[in-house]
């Protein structure tokens, strides 16, 4: 490069921000000393296992059976080999195929891929996929309606995926009761797609979503984002006409883990098969008539036809998705139903307890909920969260961080690990704060 010293390499950095002295590093340490320092630094993190937690807003605290971790670390699965080459092992391919099968059964659609990065990228990919399939016959060319209650972090990803492709996003309005405005939804007929979430960002289940497909018609794709665990007790979107279903896979197989790694779910009807993103494993027979598994329709992908690929997804979440498949297999249909009922019961018990506090009210009292619910407080929700944190309780998510108009609203999330002791601690901490602000 023509440099004589290492300093020449950094000559374009302004003197005002260039560090010239040595780094403030300690001298050599023993392994024992390094471990002690590492533990001290890690102690600054908040461990969801160390205190009652009602934080959700996208990722869920969960219980992952020990068997999942044991199986996932076996050498047959945990390798440095990226599982998208055709010569990937039959065992890995079959495990991927089983994952697809379980996701397909879960959402009620015939086709699923081997995962996406997360729910947000899955939603964005579903929208672009729907536009590719529906735009030619759409009367509203390149238009997609998105629920006004999509969380801002997910909407941001959707906007990033669509803005360069000439896709116009319009808002699908909700009524003051939190439900989708079905009368207004008629305006979406003829668009490429409609994207809604069930439950929505407030944890509410909107029964009107089941009527959306009939309203928007067959020429417009219905995309539904789901809480995958809720499908143990809630009707599968494929039953009420969803064309594509996406969601966060994280509750199956892996904890929140500081935001990642996680994986997204993606399923669709056969109409979208050749335009869907990600890897697909197919089942066939070999020359001896034995079952064989293979990556199929790979020409959709960037490692085959970069200029014509349906998606640029590359780094793969397969190992994490297989952990989800292991978890789902261990649960089985009855276990999934019990898990969903347990979470629903915990949310209902927490809702009843919290709403018994004077000055606290439910945001939408007539809406059924799953996992999460939203309350209105007599003051700033962020202040309430800080107060409860000082009391040793992660009391939820202040929705003012997403929408300024909801600064007094608190999103409270529950899971299969929520206990009565946790609920009592939440009520005590929140009651203390309400008493202070109401004094």
PLM segments and residue spans:
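Gly-rich Lys/Arg/Thr-decorated short loops/hinges at beta-loop-alpha junctions or inter-strand turns
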Residues: 74-86, 104-109, 138-141, 162-169, ...
């Amino acid at each position: 490069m023509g440099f004589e010293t290492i300093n020449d390499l950094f000559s374009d950095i302004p003197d005002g921000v260039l560090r010239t002295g040595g780094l403030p590093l300690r001298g050599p340490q023993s392994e024992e000393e390094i471990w002690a320092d590492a533990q001290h630094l890690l102690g600054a993190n908040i461990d969801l296992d160390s205190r009652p937690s009602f934080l959700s807003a996208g990722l869920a605290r969960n219980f992952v059976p020990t068997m999942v971790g044991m199986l996932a670390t076996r050498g047959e699965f945990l390798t440095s080999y990226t599982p998208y080459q055709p010569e990937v092992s039959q065992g890995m391919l079959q495990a991927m195929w089983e994952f697809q099968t379980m996701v397909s059964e879960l959402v009620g659609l015939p086709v699923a891929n081997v995962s996406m990065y997360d729910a947000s990228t899955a939603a964005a990919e579903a929208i672009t996929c729907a536009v590719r399939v529906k735009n030619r016959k759409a009367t509203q060319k390149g238009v997609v309606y998105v629920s006004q209650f999509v969380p801002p972090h997910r909407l941001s990803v959707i906007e990033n995926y669509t803005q360069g492709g000439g896709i116009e996003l319009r808002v699908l309005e909700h009524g003051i009761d939190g439900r989708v405005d079905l009368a207004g939804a008629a305006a979406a007929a003829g668009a490429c797609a409609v994207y809604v979430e069930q439950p929505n960002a407030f944890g509410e289940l909107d029964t009107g979503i089941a009527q959306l497909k009939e309203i928007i018609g067959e020429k417009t794709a219905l995309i539904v984002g789901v809480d995958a665990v809720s499908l143990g007790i809630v009707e599968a979107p494929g039953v009420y006409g969803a064309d594509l279903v996406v969601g966060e896979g994280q509750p199956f197989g892996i904890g929140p883990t500081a935001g990642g790694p996680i994986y997204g779910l993606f399923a669709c009807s056969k109409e979208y098969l050749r335009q869907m993103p990600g890897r697909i494993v197919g089942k066939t027979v070999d020359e001896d008539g034995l079952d064989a598994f293979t990556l199929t329709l790979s020409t959709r992908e960037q490692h085959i036809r970069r200029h014509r690929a349906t998606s640029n997804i590359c780094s793969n979440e397969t190992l994490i998705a297989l952990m989800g498949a292991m978890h789902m297999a261990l649960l089985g249909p009855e276990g999934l139903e019990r898990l969903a009922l347990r979470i629903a019961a915990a949310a209902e018990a927490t809702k009843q307890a919290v709403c018994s506090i004077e000055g606290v009210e439910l945001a939408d009292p007539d809406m059924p909920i799953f996992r999460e619910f939203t309350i209105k407080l007599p003051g700033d929700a962020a202040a309430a969260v800080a107060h409860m944190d000082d009391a040793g309780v992660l009391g939820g998510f202040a929705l003012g961080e997403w929408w300024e108009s909801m600064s007094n609203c608190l999103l409270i999330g529950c899971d299969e690990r929520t206990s009565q002791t946790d609920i009592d601690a939440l009520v005590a901490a929140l009651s203390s704060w309400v008493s202070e602000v109401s004094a």
